[in-house]
Amino acid sequence: MKKTIRIFAFILAISMCMGIVACGNKPEETTGTSSASATTSESGETTGITSGTDGTTATTDATSSGTVDPPAPTPIYNKLLTEKHGEYLTVKYNPAYCELSVSTKEGIGDSYKATVTVKMKDGYKFKGFSFDSGIANGKEVASMKTEYTFDVEKECTLFVNCAMTYAYHLNGGAHVSGKDTVEYDADVTYYKNPNSLPERGYFKRDGYVLVEYNTKADGTGEGTSLGSRPYVGDRAKIDLYCIWAKEAPASDFEYEKTGKAVKITGYKGSEEGVLAIPAEIDGSSVISIGKRALAGTKAETIVLPASVMELCEEAFADSEMSTLVITDAIVEFTGETTGGWGMSAANTVIDGCENLANLRINAVLYPLYVTYIESNMKYDYMLWAKDRKKIVYVAGSSGQFGFVAEDMEKALDDEYVVVNYGTNANISGAFWMEYLSKLMGEDDILLWAPEDGQYLFGNNRLNNRLWRSIECNYDIFRYVDIRNYTNVFGSFESQQKDKAINSTIREYDRFNDAINNNGDLFNKRDAGPVKGGFTFNQFPSEECIAFMNTQFDKMAENGVKVYISFAPMSKSVLYDIAKKTQADLDEYSGNVAKNYHGTVISDIADHAIDSGYFADSEWHMTDAGAHLRTEILIRELKAQLEKEAK
């Protein structure tokens, strides 16, 4: 408990910083009242938790003097585009939010004047021009005027910063402004579905826990966990309603009190609906759920407040809940069970919870990996594309370094949105496929090109690599049943220990300038000495393969074409170091075709590419190599589509 109290002090310090930041972010507020529906009580309390969003529901060149209006974008374009104007000036903007014109006028020597004029589209807001990167990345505002004239004397990049509106309806809660509805500008310079507000004390309601935001006041719309991304679509404004759960009375609990900290040690109540743990008891913060404290409870849903930072072993063991709502303020798991493959106190917290399918996580701490190359950008584009005709390319890091989604979009005449879902080869492919099966439908294409290894082939054990990838959108868990996976809380524990040590202020709208909206990594990558090796046929258990095939079958039933290819491989490593033969390749590709329900569209030998196109590993290609390898995939994909069209 003393260790937990020290953690509590640490988190409290972070929370104070959060409060300062929250006060500094002055929202644009409106005077409105939330309109609760008939099924919501007068107090704004909801009696259930929604299942949420699980599916049930060009470059132009300017002359040295003149004005250039960019061509009208195709309907799929909702991305940050790059235009070159004159010798030095690059402008980045999103045509979904604004119209742009640029004129240049000759100056002295190589310099020239540029005038950039922006006209916002209905509902979107202009947040100013900035150089080198977006304001979200900490760059200063160069001008707030919609017509900006400046001297261009050297290479420079001008960003047009834009925002949409998130309107939060308090639904019985309170805000420092005293209003029922408050509006926040959400930066869309890069992201299309900005993160919602995390749990940093923006909205409060005495005796209640804020469970989620919802598109309907009664909680029956699309739900979004605090800090995650709601689906925005093409809207310039989205309405989100606070959904509250009434706290259980303190008399229902047994607890220990140490100073200003409370540890719950038992539960005496009989709640069968929503059991919301109080944030305070006797004026002290509830920071810990003790060993077996909530074991055997009958509640369908258990909700933890943001004050809870410690879970002890078997905290919820043998409970009947189907939904557990927690926060990422939990940074400590304690107990006697340690060591072994996935054996930790963290994994015991849900022992025997056979009905627990739904894990909801509200964000409290700042993200560590907001600009991580495996994460934020890809999932934003995937969410935006969920109702569009699309191709989703799934792989490990070979997808980051060896595939260019923009090339494929252009080659297919923009008929498809193409998402580069290359992440990491050590993340469960089963998790990705279950998630993606809820976001893909008729005429979509899944293009799966896994590196050889148990994880991408369907091993269902989760690890901290996954958590790094999803920490900016925990709502990916709304699309999966956690009973299908092992080491759920053990892997979460690993991530949270990292956060507890390294937590600092990193806002959600920061982005990586080296990754485009499609998820392509477009930095300059030169060829380098390539080492490594290849071990084929590393398949997981039959049960894991069967689960992968269940997801592929679901996609096929929904009209998705499931195509299988192979990751790019350094030819010299493959043949000279790993000593693989054509017979080895044939055996491996044959096993992939035999084990998985999909159509193999590639010859594996075609993806063994000259080592001069690889950068720092046998899987990671140079930027030129990524374009070359994408051309191979495009040819294979076109051939398959033409074959099916006959």
Where are these predicted regions, by residue range?
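Secreted/periplasmic serine-hydrolase-like ester/acetyl group-modifying domain
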Residues: 459-560
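Bacterial signal peptide processing site
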Residues: 24-26
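Secondary-structure capping and domain/repeat boundary segments
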Residues: 66-247, 335
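Structural signature of tandem-repeat unit edges
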Residues: 7, 252-260, 270-287, 297-310, ...
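Histidine-centered active-site loop/cap adjacent to the catalytic His
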Residues: 615-646
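Membrane/wall-proximal cationic-aromatic binding patches
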Residues: 69, 360-412, 434
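C-terminal motif of bacterial Sec signal peptides marking the signal peptidase cleavage site
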Residues: 19-22
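Membrane-embedded segments
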Residues: 390-473
